[in-house]
């Protein structure tokens, strides 16, 4: 068995016949919960002694294209006016001018009737600004102002117990699905909830998030959640991935979980495309869990017992949620390929 060291220690699989406590066991223990211009001047650095020392034309960066000037053409502060303030203003007016009570009562009746009937002719076109405004007003009134203790603590800092990788799909917000409260989870959302392997250059954004969550926030759990009818996984299963990309970013991104596609094709090659996608949605989660092991600080947390990895799957069609975990241990010999074998996908 070929082995490859991973930052001073190794990973290996545990065969059925082996029971040594020194061996690593990394397996999915199914626990199901059902809920219905760089410059090239260096190459020509030799200069004549008669030349004058070059100077900058201006002491600021020069770009190939001017930076865009971005200025908001409107701005509105939200949450400063609310229903209660309007009611108080009306009460004050009626106290000062009692003769308006009859007129006010009639107006209130008209407003009430209009709100109750709500005919289709009264419906307005979708207003994105008003939707955001009303959404914040509702949040502030029903949640922020009713829980000052929670938001008071959050003003001091955050200490989430979870780091969650979830899909950007608008139907699967993890805070709604799992009823997370503000401060509970440090969330990263992207296409198909994928975690790329450790790479300081190519995937720095994801790496920075994992590093911050593990080393600074001290999260205790990293959860990767897949979901039903995932467009990213459908793309992974559909794209030829032969180097002739038809997209600027998507195909290169979903290649992260190409091992999951390979496994599904080898095992379900004759099955319907929808069934293949459903299987790949779960297998891609396992690929991401394995990729998390390539981050040194994640492995360190697993060894110390301060961090746990979990996989999840949300079926919003059936209203069900699956959760599984990974067990981790130390071994004297291991290889990256062994990790792949344990998770049942091919490198």
UniProtKB/Swiss-Prot annotation:
InterPro entries: Beta_CA_cladeB, Carbonic_anhydrase, Carbonic_anhydrase_CS, Carbonic_anhydrase_sf. PROSITE patterns: PROK_CO2_ANHYDRASE_1, PROK_CO2_ANHYDRASE_2. Induction: Expression reduced by 70% under dark conditions. Changing residue 280 to S: Loss of nitrosylation and decreased carbonic anhydrase activity, but no effect on salicylic acid binding. GO terms for cellular component: apoplast; chloroplast; chloroplast envelope; chloroplast stroma; chloroplast thylakoid membrane; cytosol; plasma membrane; stromule. The modification Phosphotyrosine is found at residue 203. Residues 1-113 form a transit peptide. It is an enzyme of class 4 (lyase). Pfam families: Pro_CA. Disruption phenotype: Reduced levels of seedling establishment associated with altered cotyledon photosynthetic performance at the onset of phototrophic growth and prior to the development of true leaves. These phenotypes are reversed in high CO(2) or sucrose supplemented conditions. Decreased resistance against avirulent bacteria. In plants lacking both BCA1 and BCA4, impaired CO(2)-regulation of stomatal movements associated with reduced beta carbonic anhydrase activity in guard cells, and increased stomatal density. It catalyses: hydrogencarbonate + H(+) = CO2 + H2O. The modification Phosphoserine is found at residues 175, 266. Strongly expressed in aerial tissues including leaves, stems, flowers and siliques. Accumulates in both guard cells and mesophyll cells. CDD domains: beta_CA_cladeB (cd00884). The modification N-acetylalanine is found at residue 114. One of its GO terms (biological process) is carbon utilization. Belongs to the beta-class carbonic anhydrase family. Reversible hydration of carbon dioxide. Required for photosynthesis in cotyledons. Binds salicylic acid. Together with BCA4, involved in the CO(2) signaling pathway which controls gas-exchange between plants and the atmosphere by modulating stomatal development and movements. Promotes water use efficiency. This is Beta carbonic anhydrase 1, chloroplastic. It comes from Arabidopsis thaliana. The gene is BCA1.
